[in-house]
Amino acid sequence: MNFNLSRISALQIFQLIRFSTLILIGVVFSKAGLATSEIGQYETFLFLAGAVSFFWLNGLIQGFLPIVRGESNSAKNAQFFSIFYLLLIFSFLAAGFVLIFEQSISGLLLNGSDVPFLKYLLIYLLVSSPASLIEYIYLVQNHSRKMVVYGIVSFLLMFLLVTLPEVFGKTIEYSMAGLVASVVVRFVWLLVLLFRYSTPIPDVAFLRKHLKSAAPLVFSMFLSGSAQYVDGFIITSFFDEATFAVFRFGAREFPLVLLLANAFSASMLPGFANQSNLKTNLEQIRQNSEKLGRTAFRKCTGFQ
C-alpha cells in the first residue's frame, strides 16, 4: 500500500510508540506478579538514567536539527558522525559521574539503597543516548516510513526482551539485561546508519556552530525539565524503592497533546537549515500548528 507519511506524522507516531511501550511494560510487570520493590528497582534505574542525561541529550539534538544538511545533499558529510561523537562524549561523562559519585547518590538521593544494577546502568548510559540519534537521522533524511518501521521493530524488541523474563518467572535482573540488550541493538543499527549517511571524520567547524546553538537549549532543558526529577528525588531520598514504584505509577500519565506538540516542533526544525525556504517553512508551521490544535482539541474533548 502506497501512502504519503509526512515527517511530522512519522515522528509523532514514533513518540507515541515509544511512550506506549513504556506504559505497557509497567502493566506487564504489575500483572506478572512482580514484587513492588523489584518494579521500584526498574523505575529507579530509568529515573537515574534520565536524570543525568535528559537535559544535554535533548538540548544537543534540538540544537543540531536546524543546522544539519539532509537528504538534498547526495554526497556524504561528517555532520551525523560529529554529533554522534559529541553525544558519546557526554554519555561517557554521565556514566563517569554516576560511577564516581555512586556512594553520594546512594546516601543522599536513594535513602541508603545501592544504585540499582550499576554495571547495566553504566552500559545503558553509554549506548542509549547516542542511539536516540537514529530517529532524527531518519527525520533529517526525510525517511518517514523507515522511521515508523524502526520504531515498531525496536520497541517491540525492547518490550519482549524486558517483559518475557518476568512472564517466565525470572528475576528483574533478567529484564534489566534485556533492556540493555535492546539498546545495544539500537546502537549497532545507529553505526550502520552513520556509515551509510556520513563520514567518520569530525567536522570541527560544525561542532563549534552546534555547541554555540545548543548551549542555551541545554540550559533551558535543565531548568524546564528538572522539576519532575526534583519530585522523584524527594521520594527516593526518604522512602524505599517499593514506595517509589507506587509514586511513579501514580504520577504517570499519557501526555498525548504534549507528545504530539513536541514531535511537531522537532520535525519542523530541519526546515530551517535552508534559509532560502524560510517563508515557506513559516507558512508550513502556521498550517500544521492550526491542524494540530484542532486535532488536539477534538481528542481532549472526546476524553472528557
Segments predicted by a language model, with ranges:
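Signature of the first transmembrane helix
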Residues: 2-62, 95-99, 159, 215-241
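Alpha-helical transmembrane segments of multi-pass membrane transport and lipid-handling proteins
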Residues: 81-110, 160-167, 283-304
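Membrane-interface junctions at transmembrane-helix termini in multi-pass inner-membrane proteins
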Residues: 127-149
